[in-house]
Amino acid sequence: SSSAASDVYKRQVLMDWLQNKIWPAEAGLNDEDIYWGTMLSIAEMLKTGTTCFADMYFAMDKVAQAVNETGIRASLSRGLVGLTPDADEKLQDNEMLFKNWHGKADGRIRVMFGPHAPYTCPVPYLKKVVAKAGELNAEIHMHLCETAGEVSDCVKEHNMTPIKLMNSLDMFDCGTLAAHCVHVSEADLDIMADKKVRVAHNPQSNLKLASGIAPVPA
């Protein structure tokens, strides 16, 4: 659903890219922009043989509509940021997305809860997300260990890596799709293996933003 921004901002570190480019650009998008951006992305995916994708964004009803109309499969999450005044409202949006779309389109649409990342979701908010996901027997999609800075900041604040922090919150017991996982330790990998955490490797984004390369062979 963010195809329109995919070729615009090259070679920028993640936080500069998000704060100064992507988030301001996204503030100007409306539901129709997201619908047609999703349709474009789906066309590009199908053209190259991709038949399933995972997306975390906003106006996800429009994304689900595009998935329903095109025949592709998708795992959809409402992107959740716990730092804004409407954070609880967005969690309710994700709940409604789950109730309205999970298992729909002949089972092609799966809905997860989408806390964006450790640096945008404080622990009290993450606890709410995990509780709601557990209540609905839903899984969770989250960006984890994308950059070295994310990991070091998390260790400074919590004395734990992002993987260890999420494990301490019982997030992985819900079933988790973790995006990126570039900077993970051997101890992190042991936790991920034990909890059956699935990784969505994103080499194009990680290389464009010089975040690093996930240890996929591990």
What is the predicted role of each segment?
Residues 1-5, 9:
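Single conserved hydrophobic/aromatic residue that forms the stacking wall/gate
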Residues 3, 140-147, 200, 210-211, ...:
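Short acidic/histidine-rich active-site segments
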Residues 23-35, 112, 116-118:
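Active-site mouth loops of central-metabolism enzymes
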Residues 51-52:
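Short acidic/polar active-site loop segments enriched in Thr and Asp
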Residues 62-182:
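Metal-coordinating catalytic core of metallo-dependent amide/deamination hydrolases
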Residues 171-218:
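Active-site-adjacent C-terminal substructures of enzyme catalytic domains
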